Amino acid sequence: MEILTKEWNSYIESMKSALTKNKEWQEELDSCLAMAEDAKNGAEGKIFDLAAYKANHGIDFKESVAFLNKKADEGDIFALKTLGFLYCLGVFNPFDKSKNSLVEIDTEESEQKAASYFKRASDLGSVHANVWFAMHDCIYAAVESDKPEENTEPAPSSEDFLKAERSALKAIEESKKPGCDCTPEGMSTIYYWLSRVYASNNPLNPIHDEEKSKYWEEKSKKFKK
């Protein structure tokens, strides 16, 4: 993968310009320069980190995503998670807003891609990916129930609610194991969405339970602190 490309150099120059108005960019600039230098010198891990950073910011996008996909096909969990988050959260480039449209999130295609990457990472043992995969089930069951007249997706069935509960509780249980790669933010979020599943008033929801909903909502709030 090419390191010091025209797009990358332009991004670095934009960051340097931003420093004149906001000194907080200094830390990120230093990190990017060090990462690129290490990658240029052949440090495998840094090449990987640079590809992930570039993809997330829409820099040399096709090449960066191709590099990550190659690693993902080799069974690299971090590459799979990075691609999952890319299609779940999208691209963000503060200096070139046109890059943000490289990935259109909240579409059926992007959600399917994100779920596919998380599922592959989960199958390889990533609890973090499993949490996000379970969260996808919870969000579908909870959100699609809120305003059915505005939804384009098929309405969730009773089994969708049960599936969301099963996958969330399984991910939560696995997060207690030693060496878990979960983040506090990820766990807090899965607690929140599980609470939303229990709170759903959809008549097809067989697990509606206000008490359980409040329990997981409170757990989510405490986990953030």
Predicted regions and their residues:
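Short helix-capping/linker turns of helical repeat alpha-solenoids
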Residues: 21, 39-43, 74-76, 90-91, ...
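Terminal, low-structured helical/coil segments at or just beyond the last alpha-helical repeat
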Residues: 186, 199-225
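Canonical positions in the second alpha-helix
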Residues: 71, 120-121, 171, 220
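The tetratricopeptide repeat
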Residues: 46, 79, 129-131, 183, ...
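Short coil/turn linking the two alpha-helices of tandem helical-hairpin repeats
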Residues: 19, 51, 56-58, 89-108, ...
